[in-house]
Amino acid sequence: MNLIDLILIAIYVIGISGLIFNKNNIINILIISELNLGTLGMLFVLASVELNDILGELSGLYILTFTAAESAIGLAIVVILYSKTGIINIRHLNKLKG
């Protein structure tokens, strides 16, 4: 394990702790999930380079497309929630019933 792997693992652990401590704000949750999935994709690519295997790079590309779709859906939910309630709080998601 080299220094870059350790830094990426530390960033992932910081992201998980951010998810544990920031449960109310949707924007924070989206940013933290983007950070975690981006870090996970980079770890897959680094492992793929170290093992000389293409599967990790393809997994990194799949994770990148998944995070793009996740952020688009998450931001759409945030816009709808803010237009209905005026508050961006995860506790108000039950007001989106329609």
Swiss-Prot record:
InterPro entries: NADH_UbQ_OxRdtase_chain4L/K (IPR001133), NUOK/Mnh_C1-like (IPR039428). One of its GO terms (cellular component) is respiratory chain complex I. Its EC number is 7.1.1.2. One of its GO terms (biological process) is ATP synthesis coupled electron transport. It is a multi-pass membrane protein. Its main location: mitochondrion. The chain crosses the membrane at residues 1-21, 26-46, 61-81. The keyword Calcium does not apply. Coiled coil: none annotated. GO terms for molecular function: NADH dehydrogenase (ubiquinone) activity. Pfam families: Oxidored_q2. Gene3D superfamilies: 1.10.287.3510. The keyword NAD applies. It is found in: Mitochondrion membrane. Keywords: Electron transport, Membrane, Mitochondrion, NAD, Respiratory chain, Translocase, Transmembrane, Transmembrane helix, Transport, Ubiquinone. It catalyses: a ubiquinone + NADH + 5 H(+)(in) = a ubiquinol + NAD(+) + 4 H(+)(out). Belongs to the complex I subunit 4L family. Core subunit of the mitochondrial membrane respiratory chain NADH dehydrogenase (Complex I) that is believed to belong to the minimal assembly required for catalysis. Complex I functions in the transfer of electrons from NADH to the respiratory chain. The immediate electron acceptor for the enzyme is believed to be ubiquinone. This is NADH-ubiquinone oxidoreductase chain 4L. It comes from Dictyostelium discoideum. The lineage of its organism: Eukaryota, Amoebozoa, Evosea, Eumycetozoa, Dictyostelia.
